[in-house]
């Protein structure tokens, strides 16, 4: 994960001070790309401990099409608490867009099911895409999608994925995003009888919050360790039938966690 540390260093050295929606202030760069070969290990940051349980539960929650935090709360995951209303609702965020995008004629489009079918029936298609950026529903969302658009690509029997993230909290959010999409690629590859290829991350406004600078310097002082290995213990009947206990991470030996405030 040296390239993640290189990105942190780049933002510190080249970032432009900018105001932001939260009022916190950032150092920001625009446009950056990283490529992770998923056959080299699972890209989980090792220079601080990442809360993998939250990453897995959040992805399963997205895949279920859920937009209420009740499932997350039941599993002691609090990462969406600050944005939920008094009933735990977040509006039509990721899960709704991925699984039930509303078409003008009233249809609900299951983008993820469509992707599975495309990968099995037409893997060379250049249209194997999922979008969470539904312009007509942005004003109903508790938080507009940060990881907004992703595309799958098959070559030589390997499945790759590229994500476009329009806004990226480099210190807190990005390690989650990388691990979450890497996990999704592994799951999708298993369902479609493919090997894993690359996960390509592309960032738009890529920033460090002003109250994360000290934590970033601490993380940069640490040496990366070997990447862990993801083990999926069974093959469910569909992409939507995975459970938390289906996943093991072997050999994860991170440095201690580093606490930092969330910009809301």
From Swiss-Prot:
**PROSITE patterns of this UniProt entry?**
THYMIDYLATE_SYNTHASE
Q: What is its EC number?
A: 2.1.1.45
Task: Identify the GO cellular component terms for this protein.
Answer: cytosol
Any one GO molecular function term:
thymidylate synthase activity
Q: List UniProt keywords, sorted A-Z.
A: Cytoplasm, Methyltransferase, Nucleotide biosynthesis, Transferase
Chief localisation class: cytoplasm
According to its UniProt record, which reaction does this protein catalyse?
A: dUMP + (6R)-5,10-methylene-5,6,7,8-tetrahydrofolate = 7,8-dihydrofolate + dTMP
Annotated dUMP binding sites:
21, 126-127, 166-169, 177, 207-209
Q: Does the keyword Cytoplasm apply?
A: yes
What assembly does the database describe for this protein? Homodimer.
| NCBIfam families per the UniProt record, alphabetical | PRK01827.1-3, PRK01827.1-5, thym_sym
Q: Which HAMAP family match?
A: Thymidy_synth_bact
Protein name, per record: Thymidylate synthase
The species is Yersinia pseudotuberculosis serotype O:1b (strain IP 31758)
Which taxonomic lineage is given here? Bacteria, Pseudomonadati, Pseudomonadota, Gammaproteobacteria, Enterobacterales
The record's gene field reads thyA
